[in-house]
Amino acid sequence: MDQTAIQAADAEAATANRLKYMPGFGNDFETESLPGALPQGQNSPQKCNYGLYAEQLSGSPFTAPRGTNERSWLYRIRPSVRHTRRFSNASYPLWKTAPCLDEHSLPLGQLRWDPIPAPEEKLTFLQGVRTMTTAGDAATQVGMSAHAYVFNEDMVDDYFFDADGELLIVPQLGAIRVFTEMGIMDVEPLEICLVPRGMMFKVMTTGEQTASRGYICENYGAKFTLPDRGPIGANCLANPRDFKTPVAAFEDKEKPCRVHVKWCGKFYVTEIGHSPLDVVAWHGNYAPYKYDLRTFSPVGAISFDHPDPSIFSVLTAPTEDAGTANVDFVIFPPRWLVAEHTFRPPWYHRNIMSEFMGLIHGQYDAKEEGFVPGGISLHNMMLPHGPDALAFEKASNVELKPVKLDHTMAFMFETRYPQQLTKYAAELETLQDDYLECWDGLERKFDGTPGIK
């Protein structure tokens, strides 16, 4: 290993051991990993300190309203034009993009899967993405895709950016390190992270886990933001201070590297002679972040009835129609159940929205059996769903005293658009053939006579 590589490795290790973050959501941050690297009083000096290049990364049109205008200024060792050369076609056949109407024989229905098994071969994060559903059209920046991932090998000299959308990553098994152009995030199960559209990054494992598994929402539309609280007021749900954006960190590495790109559903790769993660300082509001789901402050019914699940929204990606989401990220965290003379689990429902669910930890209160950590369920537009027979009987007859629903964390990617199943998902060996039978015990109780049955 040459001296430059040793210094780069030492610098990366030292940086990783003291990861720091800046609190806040949508803030205009500033950070530098070398003193004086960040220009003061202007964005684009004639010459930057340390011989750096100034470059702007825009996440919105220049003329977007101030409240939705996103950009960051990066001060880097090389400009991004040096981070791509001639592209070659690449293939990741299990990562699909909307519109995707794969041919398969699985008919319409409510669906549930056990966890995707750990890979037998070596897979990086990029190689381990498996698309379950797609919705909308990435080329028109509408809709989303829901993926699962499994991997057991680090992206060492491989880097990736997604021009089709931002990536919301939800680890379920194994902590990961996400090294982006703008800093490093360590993310463990019960945390999430978001990598903005077009931002270069690589993913590695951390800790003792030999394989990592989780979920990804690829959001093609308007970026995720915090939902309006309405009458809830100024506090609760996901509070801005609990979102953490990494401080600047860079990788000064001179060796053959590969940059992979996803653009309008196709993959490309280019070879360069250095790391593209070379941003020494930056300022702006277009940035990655992480969030600990355990800091979510839930609200709920303190008298009777079960409120709509929208009260559990962590993030929402809006459309032009007010209150109609391109995709919502919703969680079902630990909480107290105290409603009186009320059926406390989620009620039976048919919905214009399409719901992709995963379970990070514990049990889900409407499905105590069959829906396991690492599992997936899909309840598509207007298909009925709700508690299974066991959960219904238990909740209908239990003594209604205050109960702490603990040791649980389920989530949902909910979109306005129908979610089309991929061939991979339709033919996955972990698909539960007997899922629909969970409602078989819901027998007729009506006999025409009044009274509680």
Curated annotation (Swiss-Prot):
The active site is at H306. CDD domains: cupin_HGO_N. It comes from the Bacteria. Its EC number is 1.13.11.5. The keyword Cell cycle does not apply. GO terms for biological process: L-phenylalanine catabolic process; tyrosine catabolic process. One of its GO terms (cellular component) is cytoplasm. Its cofactor is Fe cation. Hexamer; dimer of trimers. Belongs to the homogentisate dioxygenase family. This is Homogentisate 1,2-dioxygenase. It comes from Rhizobium etli (strain ATCC 51251 / DSM 11541 / JCM 21823 / NBRC 15573 / CFN 42). The gene is hmgA.
